[in-house]
């Protein structure tokens, strides 16, 4: 048992730590881009993991995006991801997780029981889906988005590695 980790989070303990890697993004309203990403999952002894994420451009190192929030286990096999973006978007994604050997998979969405909140100046985002796969020291994910009048489609994908 990971020290002081709430029992409900034990199955997700391999997420804990710092991750870094590279990803790519695309959307019909923007040019394709590549980014460097850093993610940290931590805990404070309560029944949730803290989550911080930041990206920067591969080409010039300029900051691109960041998110902060919490990953909560609502019951075994069920998770909620609660995030805030500095662009004026908040999201609650609800989904499932499964553990098979050393592999953890999470499927999350705002479309069923989740929600998106928009500040008055935020771009219109109406749906987000995320898929995560953790296999040992590798974390990969994809994100689909429905926004600014476009249908739900692939937006981001990245592969990160555990930092020692």
From Swiss-Prot:
A motif (GXWXGXG) lies at residues 17-23. Heme b binds at residues 29, 123, 155. Belongs to the nitrobindin family. Its cofactor is heme b. Heme-binding protein able to scavenge peroxynitrite and to protect free L-tyrosine against peroxynitrite-mediated nitration, by acting as a peroxynitrite isomerase that converts peroxynitrite to nitrate. Therefore, this protein likely plays a role in peroxynitrite sensing and in the detoxification of reactive nitrogen and oxygen species (RNS and ROS, respectively). In M.tuberculosis, could be part of the pool of proteins required to scavenge RNS and ROS produced by the host during the immunity response. This is Peroxynitrite isomerase 1. It comes from Mycobacterium tuberculosis (strain ATCC 25618 / H37Rv). It catalyses: peroxynitrite = nitrate. Homodimer. GO terms for molecular function: heme binding; metal ion binding; peroxynitrite isomerase activity. Its EC number is 5.99.-.-.
């Amino acid at each position: 048992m990971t020290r002081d980790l709430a029992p409900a989070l034990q199955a997700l303990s391999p997420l804990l730590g710092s991750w870094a890697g590279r990803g790519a993004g695309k959307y019909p309203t923007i040019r394709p881009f590549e980014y460097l990403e850093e993610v940290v999952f931590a805990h404070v002894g309560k029944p949730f993991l803290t989550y911080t994420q930041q990206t920067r451009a591969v080409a010039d190192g300029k900051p691109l995006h960041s998110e902060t929030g919490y990953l909560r286990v609502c019951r075994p096999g069920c998770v909620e991801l609660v995030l805030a973006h500095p662009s004026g978007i908040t999201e609650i994604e609800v989904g499932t997780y499964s553990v098979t050997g050393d592999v953890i998979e999470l499927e999350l969405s705002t479309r069923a029981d989740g929600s998106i909140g928009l500040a008055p100046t935020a771009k219109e985002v109406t749906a987000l889906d995320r898929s995560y796969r953790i296999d040992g020291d590798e974390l990969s994910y994809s994100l689909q988005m429905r926004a600014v009048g476009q249908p739900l489609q692939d937006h981001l994908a990245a592969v990160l590695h555990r930092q020692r």
